[in-house]
A protein has these predicted regions:
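Transmembrane and membrane-interface helices of multi-pass
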Residues: 10-11, 15-233
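Short linear motifs in intrinsically disordered/low-complexity regions
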Residues: 3-5, 22, 260
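Non-catalytic propeptide/linker segments at domain boundaries
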Residues: 237-243
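Membrane-embedded segments
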Residues: 253-256, 260-266
């Protein structure tokens, strides 16, 4: 009898260790859900009268890409990366939706420098729809839960390789998908005229003439990426600053040479 009790005591810890780690699986589910929730929250307010669902498709692809990126890192680094990326994306979504509710337009990142001028409109926030505020609270809650339940464990290369493959596949779809939509441009009135071309999806995506039109083509995440990449918005590294300074000196030297009086040979 006593021997059986000892055996049960020895096997109990092993049984506990063998139990599924539900916390890990919940964390794995919450990370892509949180990233997609940012796009879904934006879509509710930014879809406009067209009601296009393309932003949700792109949001799903970007949720896969970003989840693969953070889950492919060691647990500690991945958790920090998730918190930073998700936090910035959520703030971007809140600012863009808030601006759109007020002005029916979206902003480029370069317009954010004038955000301080909007302090006069703070009182208007009280009149914003309740579901906008509830959506913000939901984003905060999802972010906190995902950080808290972020999967922990030993780092292994298989995880990174799988993440790279997943990122590459989703990224390939996100890159090609806008071009699949351009067939709709043939239905635009006066499609061959300059006016028609400016109304086309291709012009919205390639020329970036309007932030909201770009969003309707490719969603919030890809709009943000296109804005950063096309408008060269990135940290001013020492190399960039040095190259910029060299270019400025070259231009100054050119105009200084032009200002010198030229000898008339006649």
């Amino acid at each position: 009898m006593g021997k059986n009790k000892k055996q049960r005591r020895k096997t109990a810890p092993a049984a506990v260790k063998a139990a599924p780690d539900y916390k890990k699986y919940i964390g794995l589910f919450l990370i892509p859900l949180a990233f997609f929730a940012v796009e879904a929250f934006s879509w509710v307010f930014l879809r406009g009268s067209s009601g296009t669902k393309w932003p949700l498709v792109f949001g799903l692809l970007w949720a896969v890409m970003l989840s693969a990126a953070v889950l492919g890192m060691p647990a500690g680094a991945g958790r920090i990366a998730f918190g930073v990326v998700y936090g910035l994306a959520a703030i971007y979504a809140v600012v863009e939706t808030g601006y759109y509710i007020l002005f029916k337009e979206m902003m480029w990142l370069s317009d954010f420098r004038y955000a301080s001028e909007g302090s006069d409109y703070f009182s208007v926030l009280l009149s914003y729809p309740v579901h906008w505020w509830l959506g913000i609270l939901a984003l905060i809650g999802l972010g906190v839960a995902a950080v808290w339940l972020f999967p922990r464990g030993k780092y292994n290369w298989n995880q990174t390789v799988a993440a790279i493959v997943l990122f590459a596949v989703a990224g390939n779809f996100a890159y090609r998908l806008p071009y699949e939509q351009f067939d709709q441009d043939k239905d635009v009135k006066y499609a061959r005229s300059d006016y028609g071309r400016m109304q086309s999806l291709e012009a919205a995506y390639e020329n970036l003439f309007n932030t909201h039109r770009l969003y309707q083509v490719c969603g919030l995440y890809q709009t943000l990426w296109k804005d950063i990449y096309t408008h060269n918005i990135y940290p001013l590294t020492p190399a960039y600053t040095q190259a910029h300074e060299a270019g400025r000196e070259e231009i100054d030297a050119y105009f200084a040479e032009k200002d010198k009086p030229q000898k008339n040979e006649m």
